[in-house]
Amino acid sequence: EELPDPRASFAGHTLETPWTELQLAYFAGCAMWTYLTLPFLLAEPGITAQEIEPWEESGEQWRRLAVTFPANIATHSTHQTLYIGNDGLLRRHDYDVEIAGNTPGAHYPSDYVEVQGIRFPTRRRIYPRQADGKPMTEPLVVSIDLGDIVLR
């Protein structure tokens, strides 16, 4: 089976539209590539980032970075927002999943481990995001747990 233009194959999809196995592989590949390469991905040519007003959540104030990706980088959406804690770690990552009808998501990376001097979140939870920017606590849309991270 082949999917020559995977992104175009999602035209007209909503969150409820079923995906083929190849569409799932495309999305999972884009998602994990983005998740594992941030913040280094931000150094790529054509990506723009601008600090915007801070955000209060869970008794903390997080700095926010509005990021715009060029068309040549396959990712969830052109416009994304990163939330950075006082320790410099990514606390939240917002995006609208363009291939699923621009479904808004609030992604929470946590449980960081250090591998060869680089911090990686081993737990990721993604929830629907409301119009006011606040996450819904249910339903849990995506759950990712990583272990045994090795850099070669």
Predicted segments, located by residue:
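Broad, structure-driven detector of short, well-ordered beta-strand segments within folded domains
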Residues: E1-E2, L82
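Flexible, processing/modification-adjacent segments and terminal tails
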Residues: E2-I73
